[in-house]
Amino acid sequence: MLISKTPLRVSFFGGGTDFPEYFNSKKTRVIGTSINKYIYVFQNKFHSNFFNHNLRLFYRNNEFVKKVKDIKHRVFRRVLQDANINKDIEIHVSSEMPSFVGLGTSSSFTVGLINLINNFKYKSHLHSKILADKAIFLERVRLKENVGYQDQILAAYGGFNSIELSKEGYKVKKISPKFSIKKFSQKLYLVYTGIQRRAEKIEKKKISKLNVNLSYLDTISDIANEAYKCFTNSKNADFFGKLLNETWALKKKLHSQVSNDKINNIYDKAIDAGAAGGKLLGAGAGGFILFYVEDNKKNKFLRTFNDKQYIKFAFENLGSKILKI
């Protein structure tokens, strides 16, 4: 049995500018990290000649089909078609976190599945860039989904990264702050809004307003560049909360559906409880809100949100990996 273990991600700065519709004309930067929350894709063989189906897929729905073209899940169908695998395979998907909550789950699944099937078919490991490129090509070109580049890159590479994007391509740089990453990450909290939503519809609407939103996106990109300088030069992370707030204020202007009363209420509640800053993760309309809370404000913050509303996480450095059992 083969298993791909692929991290989810938290995006800090530059989100919304990682679309070629933007960076093909303006160089930009995205800052984010893979985290220690994972999606697992399991592969096993079975003898299909003894069954009335040739392929088994287990995810939110279960599929038992005779032909690859009959698979309803578009990513499964494309990846298996490209690898020319049409029988004797069973695949299970298991995620530590729900889908459609702003943690890049969909792209982490795509990266993990491509990694798994490549290892199964060719008995070889893909370089992180090749893996990210394959996932981006599949989602954006083959499936024509309205997604950016950062999710696939962070899932494939792993680590705390700056991603520079332009019409020439992208460059990934590991960020090594002068302050402790561990202590920094201990001040980060994900608060759940209780809302799951599909990012693609919101991203499509934001892309349609690109010309209207251009000045907002330019400023979001400028903030990401400022954050990169702070991460590489500052001796502490005092800047982080302020820049999160500035990014969130701009993100809400990209489309009226990015935020709503529930999200605004949670955000205001967290700021009143001592959070130095925060922003909604992902496309908008639901999912998790990231907050930065200094140690001397932690107790008040935790009294405000119970342990069913928030989750802690740590940075991870490995990206998508293959495990063999």
Kindly give the residue locations of the regions a language model identified.
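Metal-dependent C-N hydrolase catalytic cores
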Residues: 63, 98, 110-114
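Glycine-rich active-site/cofactor-binding loop and its immediate structural neighborhood
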Residues: 286
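Short gly/ser-rich anion-binding loops that grip negatively charged ligand groups
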Residues: 65-69, 100-107
